């Protein structure tokens, strides 16, 4: 099974990300890491002629990826670039944003690595790439032609290409599984691209958020962590009386909109509960949010 690690981070080199993952006990090679800079550079290279000028606003990693694609990096709008590609890095200046805006106003195609509005730093939450992108959009009135990062599906599309052998067809979409802990990036990107997805509970998403997720943020599968990849996962099914059953667990919503389950410690119960809650939402039935079970699935490993 081929494994690719995708990240919206556009400033960290693949080797740096790989070293961090290795520190978690994983066996990872840098080529398995797909950053938003890798994806953005490949997008730009397909859109402009080989050797075309590209104005780059971003970290050294983004610049190296653009150069590796055979494109000429320029710094000023006066150099008449065919495209502008914008990422995030902490030393970005007003003049760099202005040059990007001037080039876009002159007709350069506009690409961005991601549109994350914020980025966590040691001292708190700081403006992310998306906030800087919005400055250029505000100045020009032009939206990016494409975004490399999630929740767009481009990163998963590129992963299919990069996982294939040289000259081979991309890995088929139906053979791919997008895995992540964020519904509004990892899972939404999978849904936008038509990929099956697995939401894990080892990060920011909790059971309540899963049960209340709107359609575009719902995963195909739910698990406590990645150990579930090596275990069978029963499919939830709807019974004629309206109950949802998954394995030995079940969930139901009564006439008052209260959701009940028979086991708050089992992942199968959470899977059934999500199906019951999602069905009620899609049918326009009221769901008593205060009645949502407080699942305790830490360590369930299912």
Positions of the model-derived regions?
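Asp-based, Mg2+/Mn2+-dependent phosphohydrolase catalytic module
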Residues: 18-31, 41, 45-302
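Alpha-helical substrate-recognition element adjacent to the catalytic core
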Residues: 1-39
């Amino acid at each position: 099974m081929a494994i690719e690690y995708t990240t919206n981070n556009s400033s960290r080199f693949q080797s740096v990300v790989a070293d961090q993952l290795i520190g978690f006990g994983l066996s990872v090679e840098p080529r398995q890491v797909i950053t938003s800079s890798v994806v953005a550079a490949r997008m730009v290279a397909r859109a402009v002629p080989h050797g075309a000028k590209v104005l780059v606003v971003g970290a050294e990693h983004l610049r190296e990826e653009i150069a590796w694609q055979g494109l000429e990096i320029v710094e000023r709008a006066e150099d008449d670039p065919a495209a502008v590609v914008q990422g995030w890095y902490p030393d970005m200046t007003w003049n760099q944003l202005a040059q990007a805006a001037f080039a876009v106003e002159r007709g350069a195609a506009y690409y961005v690595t991601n549109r994350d509005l914020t980025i966590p730093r040691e001292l708190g939450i700081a403006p992310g790439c998306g906030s800087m992108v919005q400055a250029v959009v505000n100045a020009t009135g032009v939206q990016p032609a494409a975004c490399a990062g999630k929740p767009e599906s481009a990163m998963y599309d590129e992963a299919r290409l990069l996982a294939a052998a040289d000259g081979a067809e991309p890995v088929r979409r139906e053979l791919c599984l997008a895995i992540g802990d964020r519904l509004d990036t990892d899972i939404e990107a999978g849904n936008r691209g038509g990929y099956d997805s697995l939401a894990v509970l080892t990060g920011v998403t909790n059971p309540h958020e899963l049960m209340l997720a709107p359609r575009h943020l719902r995963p195909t599968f739910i698990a406590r962590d990645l150990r579930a990849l090596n275990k069978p996962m029963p499919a939830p099914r709807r019974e004629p009386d309206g109950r949802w059953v998954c394995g030995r667990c079940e969930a139901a919503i009564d006439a008052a909109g209260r959701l009940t389950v028979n086991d708050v410690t089992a992942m199968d119960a959470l899977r059934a509960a999500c199906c019951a809650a999602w069905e009620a939402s899609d049918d326009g039935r009221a769901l008593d949010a205060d009645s949502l079970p407080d699942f305790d699935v830490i360590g369930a490993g299912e």
